[in-house]
Swiss-Prot record:
One Pfam family cited in the UniProt record for this chain: Homeodomain
GO biological process terms held by the UniProt record: regulation of transcription by RNA polymerase II
Principal localisation: nucleus
Subcellular location: Nucleus
CDD domains on file: homeodomain
Protein name per its UniProtKB record: Homeobox protein OTX
Gene that this sequence comes from: OTX
Region (Disordered): 1-63, 182-269
UniProt-listed SUPFAM superfamilies: Homeodomain-like
Source organism: Strongylocentrotus purpuratus (Purple sea urchin)
Family note: Belongs to the paired homeobox family. Bicoid subfamily.
Function according to Swiss-Prot or TrEMBL: May play a role in activation of the SPEC2A gene, binds to the TAATCC motif with high specificity. May have additional functions in the developing embryos.
Basic and acidic residues composition bias: residue spans: 8-34
Low complexity compositional bias, start-end: 188-206, 224-249
A Gene Ontology cellular-component term: nucleus
Length: 371
């Protein structure tokens, strides 16, 4: 097959040339070993035309083409050295015995780096980053010249900027940027001046002092928890109980001048108070009298009296004193003359309470009169 193709090529070339050309043209068959290929298949197609023409692979050749010898390690994949399937260095080096005319440029081995398909630079060095612009430091003389021009105009034209730039030995772009920043600073100062009085009034205005709320006044139910500093201490002497003055209460129907009372009157008032309290069925009768005697002028005789329920019992003279002050503060003083003769002034507490109960049981008609 190869011999027939070689002969056909020679005959075509000899017929196309003249006899003089045929003498000069000495066509000899080319051995496959010199081309770097063996005689075993597969084989490539060859173009029978001009010998200086570069070989073309079979997949780019029109159908019916002739076979051409070409190294197999470059045929199936033109960029075999960068093919990730084979890896780096897995393929043999290209055959250097082929003449340069038979090495097609698209089949030239490309020595690429490992990341050349992703990076634009084949040397593996990243492009230099954009350097940060250096800040310009103005001297005092430069600032004086710029401030002088700014006082004349805030928007200098290109000619004025160039003139000033030459004077202070700076580029014109730096002068332009300085004017831009200076205008922004001026606007900021104007805004602060406009908002200055308002902001100063709001920030420097003293905070209103917190009003100290007075302590809550004790209610009438809480009155037993407080003590009166004007209340004289109790003394178990009959002279004090008989001569103790009484404070007129604003709740009494008529203010009556205090009068000295004897022990008999005190006993009568005590019995009257106990009977009246039994008729009204008010608990804690005796502490009510003591509660009024301490100076708490209140019309409520039975409210909040548990405070005095744990107090020790006082002698008879103190009971007489508390009973007298309680009766003088209320309208019940008018009932003292209507009662029967009282018991002895120094009667014990137990006997007095039993006598009170007896008096309350023996005189039902008096109860209705007191109401």
């Amino acid at each position: 097959m190869e011999a027939l193709s070689d002969l056909a090529c020679r005959e075509i070339k000899m017929e196309s040339h003249s006899p003089q050309d045929s003498k000069d043209l000495n066509v000899k068959p080319v051995k496959l070993e010199r081309l770097g290929m063996s005689s075993s298949p597969p084989r490539l197609t060859i173009d029978c035309g001009d010998t200086g023409r570069s070989p073309v692979p079979s997949h780019m050749e029109p159908p019916g083409g002739a076979r051409v010898p070409y190294p197999m390690h470059l045929y199936p994949y033109p960029y075999a050295y960068s093919n990730p399937m084979y890896g780096e260095g897995a393929l043999p080096a290209p055959d250097r015995h082929l003449p340069p005319t038979q090495q097609h440029p698209m089949f030239q081995p490309q020595v690429l780096g490992p990341m050349t398909s992703e990076r634009p630079h084949s040397n593996g060095i990243d492009p230099p980053r954009k350097q940060r612009r250096e800040r310009t430091t103005f001297t005092r003389a430069q600032l004086d010249v710029l401030e002088t021009l700014f006082s004349r105009t805030r928007y200098p034209d290109i000619f004025m900027r160039e003139e000033v730039a030459m004077k202070i030995n700076l580029p014109e772009s730096r002068v332009q940027v300085w004017f831009k920043n200076r205008r922004a600073k001026c606007r900021q100062q104007q805004q602060q001046q406009q908002n200055g009085p308002n902001s100063n009034n709001t920030t420097n205005k003293p905070r209103p002092a917190k009003k100290k709320t007075p302590p809550p006044t004790p209610r009438e139910n809480d009155a037993p928890t407080t003590t009166s500093s004007d209340t004289p201490p109790f003394k178990a002497s009959p002279s004090v109980s008989s001569s103790m003055p009484n404070n007129n209460s604003i709740w009494s129907p008529a203010s009556i001048a205090p009068q000295p009372m004897s022990s008999d009157h005190l006993a009568a008032n005590m019995s009257n108070n106990s009977c009246m309290q039994h008729s009204y069925t008010m608990p804690n009768a005796q502490p009510a009298a003591g509660y009024t005697a301490q100076g708490y002028q209140s019309p409520y005789f039975g409210a909040g009296l548990d405070y005095l329920s744990h107090m020790p019992q006082f002698p008879g003279s103190i009971n007489h004193q508390m009973a007298a002050s309680a009766m003088n503060n209320g309208p019940m003083t008018t009932m003292a003359s209507q009662l029967p003769p009282p018991h002895h002034a120094h009667m014990p507490m137990g006997a007095m309470s039993s006598a009170e109960c007896i008096d309350g049981k023996e005189q039902p008609q008096w109860k209705f009169q007191s109401l």
